[in-house]
Regions:
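Core AdoMet radical
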Residues: 1-15, 21-42, 47-48, 52-112, ...
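Conserved, mostly hydrophobic/aromatic
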Residues: 31, 85, 115, 145, ...
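Auxiliary Fe-S-binding modules of radical SAM enzymes
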Residues: 146-278
Length: 278
């Protein structure tokens, strides 16, 4: 997408967002960014270290794409606990149809192995209904996730954006997404599995349906409100303008309506079990 306005948050802005989240009771923070030269490793190390120093009782999750092993090690030593890197597809041919020629499935899987070896709680996952995806591809993904045994599984429906090469492809199917979510929950009872914003974008009750299908994580947006609209991954993205506090109140009401309560604890995955303090 060459028409989107890209942005980078300064360390002071990120820390301010974390302070607001901490005030609201959040004890885990997710820092997500594109695979771009603007996201310098040294600056990220400093930011992670600053968050760790300010919030020693919080979990720090990074989602910054493919990096060198050295970079992953430096982030970990600075204080990061978790890293989310969706493998997206385990089929080599399908992977090449989704990515630029300079990217490879083998390197992405190598990154996942590095992350696990370093000691991160590692997340991987898929996009359901991505262009050219088949049922056989999904079976390969299920088998890979069973072998890899991630602590986190990120998955949601594909949603097109009008300024991308895949703009003409239909969105992923809600029911198939929910079925796969349930399969992963049965396979991995303690895994952290988010009910993604993409679900809420595909259907008004998508987030609640995701929770009922087996998701156990939701991620309110703490980014500065003036930047959120620029984070345009797909068309009609849900909640681009809601403030964090307003979003939390709405979220608590939504979950209460289906019989759930919000826990703001770290939710660490230890020895195959999810630990949450009540």
């Amino acid at each position: 997408n060459r028409n989107i306005t890209r942005y980078e948050l300064a360390q002071e802005e990120i820390l301010s967002c974390c302070h607001e989240g901490y005030r609201l009771g959040f004890r885990t923070f997710v820092l997500q960014g594109g695979e771009a030269p603007a996201v310098k490793d040294e600056g990220m190390v400093e930011t992670v270290a600053a968050i760790r120093q300010s919030f020693p009782d919080c979990a720090i999750t990074l989602s910054l794409g493919e990096k060198s092993r050295e970079a992953y090690e430096r982030f970990f030593l600075a204080g990061a606990n978790r890293y989310l890197l969706r493998h997206e597809t385990c089929n080599e041919g399908h992977y090449h149809r989704l990515h630029p020629a300079e990217m490879s499935l083998s390197h992405r899987l190598q990154c996942l192995d590095w992350l696990k070896e370093i000691g991160y709680q590692v997340g991987t996952g898929i996009m359901v209904g991505s262009p050219y995806q088949t049922v056989d591809h999904l079976v390969e993904d299920i088998l890979f996730i069973e072998r890899f045994q991630p602590e986190m599984i990120g998955m949601g429906p594909f949603l097109p954006h009008h300024d991308t090469p895949f703009s003409s492809f239909p969105p992923g199917d809600m029911e198939l997404t929910l079925k796969l979510l349930s399969i992963f929950r049965l396979m991995h009872p303690a895994a952290l599995i988010p009910a993604t914003t993409a679900l809420a974008t595909l259907a008004p009750d998508g987030r609640e349906r995701g929770i009922l299908a087996g998701a156990n994580v939701v991620m309110p947006n703490l980014s500065p409100s003036h930047q959120r609209a620029k984070y345009s991954l797909y068309d009609n993205k849900a909640s681009a303008g809601a403030e964090a506090a307003e979003g939390l109140l709405k979220l608590e009401e939504q979950l209460k309506g289906i019989g759930y309560e919000v826990s703001k604890e770290r939710g660490d995955y230890e020895n195959g079990e999810l630990t949450v303090d009540n």
